[in-house]
From Swiss-Prot:
It comes from the Bacteria. The keyword Ribosomal protein applies. This is Large ribosomal subunit protein bL36B. HAMAP family: Ribosomal_bL36. GO terms for cellular component: ribonucleoprotein complex; ribosome. GO terms for molecular function: structural constituent of ribosome. Disulfide bonds: none annotated. It holds the Pfam family Ribosomal_L36. Belongs to the bacterial ribosomal protein bL36 family. The keyword Ribonucleoprotein applies. InterPro entries: Ribosomal_bL36 (IPR000473), Ribosomal_bL36_sp (IPR035977), Ribosomal_L36_bact (IPR047621).
Length: 40
């Protein structure tokens, strides 16, 4: 999982979902699990 400043590019990838957990924003992608990231 990458820690990134901006999740804007990742949320456009097909299959991406934005999830808020414990005050942090995560992008999870079941179609392409390499595209996981968190912000904050």
């Amino acid at each position: 999982m990458k820690v990134r400043n901006s999740l804007r590019a990742l949320k456009k990838i097909p299959g991406a979902q934005i999830v808020r957990r414990r005050g942090r924003t995560f992008v999870i992608n079941k179609k392409n699990p390499r595209m996981k990231a968190r912000q904050g």
